[in-house]
Every structure is written in structure tokens, then in C-alpha cells.
Amino acid sequence: MNAKRLMVLTLLLVAAIGATAALKDTVEKDFALRSTNKQVSGVMNKVAKLKLNADEQLAMKFLYSYMPLPDMTDYSVDFYKMNVEYALRTRKEMTWGSKVPDREFYHFVLPVRINNENLDESRRVFFEELKERVKGMSMRDAALEVNHWCHEKVTYRPSDSRTSSPLASVKTAFGRCGEESTFGVAAMRAVGIPARQVYTPRWAHTDDNHAWVEVWIDGKWQFLGACEPEPVLNLGWFNAPASRGMMMHTKVFGRYEGPEDVMSKNNCFTEINVTENYAPTAKAVIRVVDEKGAPVSARVDFKVYNYAELYTVCRKQSDKDGYTYVTSGLGDLVVWASKGNRFGFEKCSVGKQDTVVVALDKTVGFSGVVELDLVPPVERNTVPPLTQEQIDVNKKRLVYEDSIRGVYEATFVNEAKAKTLAEGWGLPVDKVTHFLIGSRGNYATLISFINKASDKQRALNLLDVISDKDLRDVSLEVLNDHFYNTPDLGDGSKFYFENVMNPRIDNEMIEPYKAYLQKALNKLNVKAFKADPYKWADWVKNNIVVIDGWNPQNLRMMPTKVWQYRCSDADSRDMFFVAGARAMGIYARKDLVTGKVQWASAKDEWHDVQFETAEQVTSVQGDLKMAYTKTQRLDDPKYYYHFTISKVDDGYPVLLNYPEEGYNDMFKGGAKIDEGNYVLITGTRLGNGSVLARLCFFGINHSNATDTDLVFRTSDTDVQVIGNFNSEDKYYDFATKSTKSLLSTTGRGYYILGLINPNHEPSNHALHDIESVAAEFEQWGGKIVVLFADEDASKRHKWAEFKKMPNTVVYGTDLNGAIADELKQALNLGSDNRPIFVIADTFNRVVFVSQGYTIGLGEQMINVIHKLNEGK
């Protein structure tokens, strides 16, 4: 070894030793500081006294120095010790383990938590299953291989916002993107590959969001689509959408000192901005002033329009001179500043303005209408090159991996089995079938529960009030606890099951708590609490210490642990009140729309619990009369898709979480709503992703009804011809099992042509969007031709998932990719990435094109069709 190289290695070794020493010093100080908190000092002392080697001790102290309060209380010391042991094994047993620097190991391998999922023993399970599979591989090849393994276990399907644990996703065999990426990161970390979940909180060019995985390979962060394996890194269906992203970020456990732009820091994690890894960015400087122009230190929220609300993608505080900044993609943000009862907002076109001044020129109680035209970034799609051999090999692997997952899914309960069980139990076949098929790999839990239930109809009533996701991961212990330990009030109504027996309170992983709390509460004056639930609220307020700053992700602490530790964050305290009330037989809930904690003396007689003010309050409500004149394009506007209402509390809008239903059901006949100040937001999404937004501010008073209009702005731009496409092109038609021209199938006039991939998140979204307006497509009557790349692709398609497609849809394959090639060339598409949907006519004119990930595609196409009909 030459002298120069020896010197470099020596310097690197010294630097590594210095970095480790600095890390250890910081952790020791932070661990000691947190140990002074008397509510958790017992746990901290237990960790400090563990007999561990130096590496294990540092790792345990690192975790306990920064973990959120619910993670410390809800999981045992032994659980984290197991995770530490397996994480350290990867440094010795994986070929790349010794090459991972301490910074990447401690922040991106060791941490157990990835998102807001329930923690489980996936690290141990995944390590044991994957260690031989990746043995001897390079770090890069191992990351690609782990993602193939992930695809064998899990594929994409939408679900609710609660994040399943990695093992629950495996049991279910599907998950939404947040669950796939949580699972993918867990698998990578299990074999010692530094990994993190990258998240765009909301897209700017379309509704919804997305999450994926970044892995640290050979000194550089690179990305992949979780459970969506490609032949190389930095390739996924979201390359193009991400190039239009306004904000992409990740939460890094602990005190992280990396090269990325820091968005925020707290006791538990450092939030970093990784947008520049995917899209061109610029720095937007904001100055907040009062109505006289003087600088103000205020809360500043950077927002994008998404699902009919202005959603915060980054939150900061302006300094004493009124300044703050954000680095984001090159599109429009709404900058909303607030302090006390004053607020103001402005549009910021990132990259086009030097400094945007936001004046706090409005007060709570402001009424009026503000219109905003919001433009997203333009697409800049770049993808790494692939050989045809790489593409073909990967396709074959995907088919094989689908078959592995399919064999497992074939073990689930089917309709015939569910019918046999239902008839044997004497229960309604449709209900039992829904529960058992919906439980996926968790069917044995439900069968055991119903089979042993003393009152089987009552057991069904319990299953009826938990979510579909709960069916897939609920434990027998939870079901039995709430079935056998819920007080019998002689009330068999749905109100009783929803607000007393129901295990679910908020968006938590449901837990057994009734038997535990009943035994614990017997030491108190339960009779007095039941006679006056406000006395229970007073007890909670006076005896549960609220610890601020140690739960920034708003995780939910188990009610049993709140009792045990006598501390929690504010939201977990609220949940504890409801849990205790239900355990005593008091009707109680956390209202899904407003988030208020309430108890009821009788059906629908709800009383608010306000821990901060200790007031006894029954909500005062007023009447909202919202008028809407239906149009041919939009008969029944949907909440979230077309409009939302937010309450403007302290100058800041807080969304009302109504169900995803239409105007006709929720507001047409008027609605009761709490007194206060509100903003009604509507938006019209244009074909290029831009939004015509409208904000209507109004107040609600109990003494007078409030009249407001539900108005949607429209574009004056008529439908235009944007390209040409030959309607005589041939495809293979599945129905007739023959080669046909598009024209022979569609007949004269306008038609829709779609090119999709199987088991592909953007394609699945497109088809589900078409399903959501199937009746309107059928009323229109035009053909919708949906083509796969080849026969193998059609075999991988989950046909059973799309049973509600319009009856005007025909399926087939694109012969030798000729149609895809022509569309790419004729419409100047940057690639042939699917899905591609066009509206064209048999005079070969194209008037609409959509490529890639788009939410609301069905409605966009219906709007174009209505415009075409208006022009006749």
C-alpha cells in the first residue's frame, strides 16, 4: 500500500472515530436530559441498567433519547433490545455492513419507526427470511433483490389513512403506497441497507399524494418504487409526477446533521427537504407584516391545492424581521400566515418572484370571496436507460412473483367457504361473506371469534363498527375484550355499538382496554362519573399530565398506558377519556368531523369536553344553507373532490372531515354546523393540472341562517385539437378473439383509448376513477378501448378488482406496441409510460391526452365530453 493511500485511510479512520465519539457524547447528554422527566424516568433507568456491550448500549440509548412518548410507553424494553441486536448483526453478517457509516446506520438502519405504523417484530422476521437470499450480493443488487421479495409479498391497493404494520401488510398481501413504502423501508433496514421513506404530502398537478423508498447505496441516496421492482435504481412510474412535485421530504430519527436542507427539527426527528433530488427547485422568500407594514413573527404555512383544500406541505415561523423561506418545486404555493386572530395569504409563484410579502390584513370574522389561479410545475421526465433484455427479464420475474403471492391469496376464505360458515352459524350470508373475505389473511381470527361468541349476532354488530382495515389486522384479544367486557346497557341500537362497544376511537391501532380500565377505575368513584361524565373529565384533566413536544407525529398512546404512566400528549389524553367512558358504559366519541371530544346522555345529545377551559359545553349550532345549481357537467359535487369546508380557528383553517359524500346528501336540505367562522373552498382542475380555486369566507350564528353559494369556476377555453391519431390502427380484441381496427369497434364519433399496465398504481387509479363515473360514461355511450402491452400483461391484471367498469369498455392488446409508438410520436409524449388515455374521434383528431399518475381522470374526461356535446 503506497504512503498516500495509507494517509487517506488513516484520516478516514480518525474522522470515523471522531464522529462516533461526537455521536456518543450527544446521545449521552440527551439520554441524561430525558431521564430527568419523572413520568418516564423509570423506563430510562431500566435501559441505563441493562447489561449490554458498548455498541448495544449506545444503540439503546440512541433510540430512547429520541423516540416519541407512545413508542416508549407502548412497547417493551425487550422489544427494542431485540431490534438493536438484529440491527447490529447486519454490520457483521452482511457484506456491506461494515461499509455503512455511523451516521447512516444510526439514522437509517437502527430506527424501528418509519411512519405512523403500529410497530411489530418485522425486523427479526425479515432478517431471517432475507439473509440467505442476499448473501454475497453487492449492496445495489441486494436492494433490488429485496424489492423483488417485497413484490412477492405485497402489491398496491388503496385503503384508509391508518398505516398497517409491515407484518400486517404481508398478511393482507396488499397496501397503499404509504404502507408499501413502510414495508419496503423495514425490509431494507432489516438487512442493514440504509433506507428512508420519501413522501410528497400532496401533489400540485393532481389530487392525492405518494410515498416511495430511498436507499443509501455506495455513498449516494437513490430511489425505487416500493413493491414495484425495476431492473435498476432511480426508476419508477413516478419519475414524471415527481418532476412536477412542489415538496418531497422525509423524517429522520434523532438529531441528524446531514447535507440536506432542513425543514424543521424537534425532540424526535429532523425533517429534511429532498425535492431537489427529483425536480428543479428555487428558494421562495416570504416576509410577514401587519396591516401597517411592520414585520411580524408569525406562523407561516406553505400550501398546495389538493382534494379541494389548501393543504400544508411545509410549516415555518417567520423571524423577528418577518422573514422565512422555503425551497420547493417551480409552481404556485399559497402562503398563509397567521398570528392570534389575524391572518393573510398570498399566491407565491416559486422561481418567478424574489420576495412575497404577506400582510396580516384579515381578522377572524372576515367574509368575502377570493379567487386564485394555481399552476403546478411542468413535467421534466428523465429515466435511466434500459436494455430490452433487462425489461424482458424483469417482466418474467414480475409474473412469477405475482404467482407466488397468488398462491398465498388462494388460501383466504372464498365465497363458498363463507356461505358454509354463515349457514352453520345461522347468520346472514352477505354480512359474514363481507367480513371474512375482507379480512384477507386474518380470516382465522374472525372465524375463531364468531365461532366462540356467546351471541353471534352481537359479534357481527361489533365487526360492523370497525373499519375494513381493522378486519385485516385486529387481534382475537381485542375482539374478545370489547365483546365480553363492554357494559350491557340494554341498548341494541347502532348508536350503542358505535359509541360504547366500538374499540375504535380515532385513527389508532385498536387495542384491548376495557377489562383493564374497568379494574383500574373501580378504585375511583365510577358511580359519580356515570352520573356526571364531566366529573370524569375533571379527573382526567387533574391526573393525566400532558407532555408537549414528545409526540410530533401525533401517534396514539394506548389508553392502558396512559393510565399506567399518568401522562400523554393532548390527543392521547382525549382518546383516554373516551376509552374510560366507554369502559364505564358512557356513550362517548371523538367526533369524526370536528375532532371534538364528546359524551352523550341520550342519542344525539352530545356534550363537548374542553380540557383546556374546563367548561361544560353543549355545542351551539347554526344553519348553513348552501345553494348549488347543477350543471350538465356536475350534477352532485363531492366533498373532497370538488369542495371542502374548514373552520378558521385562530386565523388558521382546520378542515371539517365530513364523509366522502355528495352535496345532495349532506348539504342540499341545509346542514347544522357549529357557530364560528369558515371558508368554503371549491376548485376546478384543468387538463394541464392547473386549478381555478375559489375561497368563500362566511360566519355561522345560531340566531340566523347563513346563505352561501357553492360555485365552481370554469375555463373559457374551448376543447381544442391537440394532435392526430389514426383510428384505423389495429389491436387484438379479447371479446371477439380477433384483430380489429379501432374504428370498427368504436363506430363514428368520439371514443376513448387507454393504454395501461397491470398491477400498476397509476393504471389502477385511472381505472378506479373511470369506475367512479361509470354511469355517466354509459349515458354518453361512446366506446372506451383499454389495451394491455401484450397477453402476458393482461394475465397479470387483477380483473376482479375492477368489476364496476362501464359496460362500454372493451379490452385488448396493442399489437407489437404500434399504437403506443404512434401516440408517443403524434402527441409528442416524452415516453410511452402508462397509463395513457386519449379522447379522439374517427376523423383522427385528438382533443384530450393524459399520461401517468392522475387523480380524477374519469371526471376530467367526462368534462371534456360534456364540452364536446355543448359544441354540437
Task: List where the protein language model places each region.
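Secondary-structure boundary elements
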Residues: V27-T172, D208, Q390-Y565, T613
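Hydrophobic/aromatic-rich core segments of domains that either
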Residues: A32, E132-R133, M137, A142-H148, ...
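Short, ordered, surface-exposed loop/turn motifs in non-cytosolic proteins
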Residues: A282, D290-Y311, L330-D332, D532, ...
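Short Pro-Gly-centered beta-turn/loop motif in secreted/extracellular proteins
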Residues: D321-V334, S338-R342, C348-K352, E661-N688, ...
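Structured interaction patches on ligand/partner-binding surfaces of diverse proteins
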Residues: N341-T363, L686-S715
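Short active-site neighborhood of thiol/selenol oxidoreductases, capturing the structured segment around
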Residues: L742-I770, K783-L787
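Short, internal strand/loop/helix patches
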Residues: W799-R834
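Thiol-/selenol-based redox modules, centered on thioredoxin-like
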Residues: N833-K872
